[in-house]
């Protein structure tokens, strides 16, 4: 009888614990799904309120600009692959500031973020898309984050893709990224040395657009890191 009572109590507490966990997870809003330039955008309902009508219009115009520049330079097949990678747009999410890609749910749960952000490009603060400093420094930030998503979800073996990893290791060993020019005129260590993920995303910016670290553009990438240039030509297609 005592065992049955203990078991019943344990079951009750287990159910309560599960209910509390579900309630905690449900504190996050349900996004409203929109389409923009062929991409699925999961939008914070607050951004769509009438009081934010002007902000929403400006933000969507800016985001469309980012996506159009990807559409207009890449082959159609690559565009379609990228359009399968969703974007999550917050009005203003205080805990995070930088635009980022969320590859796994463990970090999201551990830091009490919405686990549904997993496998999304995340724009935590809509106004960042309108920031002049952001445009001056990082005009291809959305491409950068989508490159992370593509690396993770599309390339063979994801972030452990052998070709990218080998190119990164070779570039790191060569030391040619240790001191490079930053967009501001300073000489710094290239952000791409952080890991193979940042190396791929940073070099993709240079190959398809403009990066904030040297090599800034495609011709410079070909001169500075021909191996990665050739790999990106194979991955993204030749840009003429």
Model segments located where?
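Boundary at the C-terminal end of the N-terminal hydrophobic targeting segment
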Residues: 19-23
């Amino acid at each position: 009888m005592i065992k049955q009572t203990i078991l019943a109590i344990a079951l009750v507490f287990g159910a309560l614990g599960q209910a509390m966990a579900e309630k905690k997870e449900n504190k996050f809003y349900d996004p409203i799904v929109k389409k923009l330039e062929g991409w699925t955008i999961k939008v914070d309902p607050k951004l769509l309120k009438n009081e934010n009508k002007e902000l929403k219009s400006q933000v969507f115009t800016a985001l469309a600009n980012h996506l159009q520049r990807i559409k207009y330079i890449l082959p159609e097949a690559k565009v379609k692959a990228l359009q399968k990678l969703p974007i999550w747009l917050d009005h203003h999410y205080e805990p995070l500031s930088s635009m980022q890609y969320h590859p796994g749910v463990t970090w999201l749960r551990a830091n009490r973020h919405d686990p549904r952000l997993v496998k999304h490009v995340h724009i935590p603060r809509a106004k960042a898309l309108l920031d002049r400093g952001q445009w001056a420094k990082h005009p291809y930030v959305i491409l950068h984050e989508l490159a992370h998503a593509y690396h993770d979800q599309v390339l063979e073996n994801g972030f452990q893709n052998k070709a990218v990893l080998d190119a990164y290791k070779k570039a790191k060993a060569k030391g040619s990224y240790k001191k490079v020019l930053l967009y501001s005129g300073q000489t710094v260590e290239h952000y791409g040395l952080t890991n193979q993920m940042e190396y791929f995303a940073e070099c993709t910016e240079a190959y398809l657009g403009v990066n904030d670290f040297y090599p800034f553009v495609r011709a410079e990438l070909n001169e500075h890191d021909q191996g990665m240039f050739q790999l990106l030509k194979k991955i993204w297609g030749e840009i003429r």
